[in-house]
Amino acid sequence: AYRVRGLALFALLAVMAGGPVHAPARRIALFRSAPETAAKRTAVDYLRTHTGPDETVLVWGAEPSVNFLSRRKSPSRYSFQYPLYTNGYRNAAAAAETFLAELSSRPPAVVIDTSATNLLVPPLDPASRRRRRLPSAFDPLPPAMGNLFDLLAARYRRVDGTGVLHWAVYRQAGR
């Protein structure tokens, strides 16, 4: 009975998604490129041009599709960082410690700050961070975030922005 219901649900979802269970190749191609908006494409193109395939890239915020589409690995298991700066998150301190250790052992060649288009993401730039009013779940930021901001400020310099998104781009100091 559960198997029949499961198959019926799968078929219903496939029809609702706009096509047969075995979608033609062109629909699959459209689905695959859907997250690649013009704005994200600018960031992806920047990374493909300015980083090597073996270099890691930290996309600060909640845009792991940029790592995926640029074929650049994240330096951390935290491909989106909401748990790091959410007050009351069960393991926020341990998560921040792990994140810092991962960034220290695998320093990203480039850091892209997506906070310009996501009000839930605290900006990496101190002046922008002071001006930003974060939602109550993120304000004040957990104390461990200060260590992260200090690490990034000591090791990275802003070099560019990524076009229409106005995402700040940081490179390792001295590179």
Question: Where in the sequence are the language-model features?
Answer:
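Extracytoplasmic
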Residues: 3-174
